[in-house]
């Protein structure tokens, strides 16, 4: 990459596979896979839009699990969650941040996180790899970049400041 100078990786934030707890009987990733194989092309999954990490998480899942599920793109996570809660879609890959309140309320059931390791935000939820799709990992990340040609001493200073901030207990707590 010639246009940017990397400064710091800030966070890797898992996405989560959820179903509507009242309307979808699937209680595990393996059950979703069996359901999708029994009815190819019938199960739908919502995402925050085409090309988002959430969309890609669903496509990687479908490919690795060997299932045909229909992607329903929305204009953001909010409308997708609204339809997920209303039962208009069968599955959803979403950010933990958006989905967690609905998981905690019992309206959504979390089946797996997309990263290689479990999330501190949902420690009882297995990874999708653990839950039935070996090798599955989609790890969205957030980073800071500067324009190419930024003086190295500025990049180094920003790197230090950001890395120090990311170690602060308050920052770590907010990222859970």
Regions found by a protein language model. Give the residues of each.
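Active-site lining segments that contact anionic ligands and/or coordinate catalytic metals
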Residues: 108, 139-141
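Hinge/capping helix and adjacent helix->loop/strand transition within the periplasmic-binding protein
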Residues: 1-79, 128-130, 141-174
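Alpha-to-beta junction loops
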Residues: 39-43, 67, 85-94, 105-110, ...
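Short, hydrophobic alpha-helical packing/hinge segments within bilobed ligand-binding/sensory domains
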Residues: 80-81, 99
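Small-residue (glycine/proline)-centered packing/hinge motifs flanked by hydrophobic/aromatic residues
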Residues: 1, 117-135
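A ligand-binding cleft/hinge motif common to bilobed small-molecule-binding domains
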Residues: 55, 60-64, 90-125, 172
């Amino acid at each position: 990459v010639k246009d940017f100078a990397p400064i710091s990786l800030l966070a890797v934030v898992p996405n989560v596979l959820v179903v509507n707890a009242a309307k979808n009987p699937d209680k595990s990733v393996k059950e979703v896979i069996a359901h999708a194989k029994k009815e190819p092309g019938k199960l739908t999954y919502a995402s925050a839009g085409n090309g988002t990490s959430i969309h890609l998480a669903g496509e990687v899942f479908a490919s690795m699990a060997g299932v045909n599920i229909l992607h329903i793109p929305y204009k953001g996570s909010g409308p997708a969650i609204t339809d997920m809660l209303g039962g208009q879609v069968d599955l959803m890959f979403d950010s933990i941040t958006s989905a967690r309140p609905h998981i905690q309320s019992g309206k959504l059931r979390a089946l797996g996180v997309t990263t290689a390791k479990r999330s501190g935000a949902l420690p009882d939820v297995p990874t999708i790899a653990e839950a039935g799709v070996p090798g599955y990992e989609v790890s969205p990340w957030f980073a800071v970049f500067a324009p190419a040609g930024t003086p190295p001493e500025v990049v180094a200073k920003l790197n230090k400041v950001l890395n120090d901030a990311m170690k602060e207990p308050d920052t770590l707590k907010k990222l859970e």
